[in-house]
Regions:
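Short C-terminal boundary/hinge segments that cap the last helix of small helical domains
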Residues: 86-102
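N-terminal flexible/basic segments that precede or flank functional cores
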Residues: 1-36, 99-107
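Short alpha-helical DNA-recognition segment
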Residues: 46-64
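DNA major-groove recognition helix of helix-turn-helix/homeodomain DNA-binding modules
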Residues: 57, 76-91
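Helix-turn-helix DNA-binding elements, focusing on the entry/boundary residues of the two helices
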Residues: 38, 49, 60, 75-78
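The alpha-helix within a helix-turn-helix
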Residues: 42, 53, 82
Length: 107
């Protein structure tokens, strides 16, 4: 999706029209939301990318790409990330929308 397509879609949304979401846009948004949630939780724990990579059985460049929203991890990797980040990973996925959060485990 290029900028002019996004602008047209946004203008139509603001006008109250129903707008279909391109699957690429939805996937990119989910990847970005997931990356941001991982980054936020990692910083909250005071971990470096290398430390998180070690805990989750990844490499530091893989963590960097994921936090940047450049890749969507597999389900087994999501499980390892939740464990490495000491919490429960919550994914809420709906048509055209997603929400990703970590809920820390009780101490």
């Amino acid at each position: 999706m290029n900028h002019s397509m996004w602008r047209t879609r946004r203008t139509r949304q603001l006008a109250g029209e129903t707008v279909e979401y391109d699957q690429e846009y939805v996937d990119a948004r989910l990847a970005g939301d997931l990356g941001q949630a991982v980054y936020d939780r990692r910083i909250e724990l005071g971990l470096s990318q290398a430390e998180l990579a070690d805990r989750a059985g990844m490499t530091q460049p893989q963590v960097s790409r994921m936090e940047g929203g450049d890749t969507v991890p597999t389900l087994p990797l999501l499980r390892r990330l939740a464990k490495a980040l000491g919490g429960t990973l919550n994914l809420a996925i709906d048509e055209g929308d997603s929400r990703v959060t970590f809920t820390p485990h009780a101490a």
